[in-house]
Amino acid sequence: MNRSFLFAPGNVPRRVEKALTLAADAVILDLEDSVAPSDKPGARKSIAEALRGPRKARGYVRVNAPSTPFCFRDLLETLHARVDGVVVPKIESAADLH
């Protein structure tokens, strides 16, 4: 059970790496609102690399909303790392995930 969640912006590699070493039960690495479109490719790479390394916390990736042009690439470039879960924002119903 996750009792605490720590959010970290995916486009700041130092914060991503540091967050994964802290005592939170889960770290949510954000690719959505905290990352400008031009920074998304680097953020995806940073997140994938950090999740493959040593860590204390579970690692979740907060992808962009499925209605955006970024969601598929977020999934494609991060899920091969040791991701414990995916956070999908801006979902109003199950139909939004189909």
For each feature predicted by the language model, list its residue ranges.
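Expand to "…catalyze enediolate/carbanion chemistry for C-C bond making/breaking, isomerization
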Residues: 1-98
